[in-house]
Amino acid sequence: REVIDIRLPLWEPTDIKGIPYYNSKDNNMVWASPAELPVDPKSNAIVFLDELNSAAPAVQAAAYQLILNRRVGQYVLPKGVSIVAAGNRDSDKGVTYRMPAPLANRFVHVELRVDYDDWMSWATNHHIHPDVVGYCTFAKQDLYDFDPRGSSRSFATPRSWSFVSQLLSD
């Protein structure tokens, strides 16, 4: 399936609804929908709203109708398209805005945890440098050591280990 990656903090409210323009043929205003949203009625894409709770509150509010009603103004999301969103927890010390209750209520919330076996399977299939895999096998506790109460600006995560792998491979 096609994944349409939309980083909501980079969008404005008008980016969700689109831009109005005058339709001289019908003598009315219509909206030009965002090019990122699928228009093919047979589409089964996944619209991935990434960093949802890092988007400004006005952008989050503009997404209400798209998420709940699968439409924005005149634009209707094709029937086979799914909407998935992701964001950091407030406790992760990221740039986040509290998700408004009406928006939070439009989703099923699933909190993901780092799992060593899942990461090792992923790392093996994605050519993570053998030294990184070897170290993480030796020191499993170092795969993820983020402490939200801590003051360290650097910490180990699966993402940072993939960065180390890239550095070792270059």
Tell me the role of every PLM-derived stretch:
Residues 1-138:
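AAA+ P-loop NTPase catalytic core and its hallmark functional loops
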Residues 120-170:
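Conserved AAA+ ATPase small/helical "lid" subdomain
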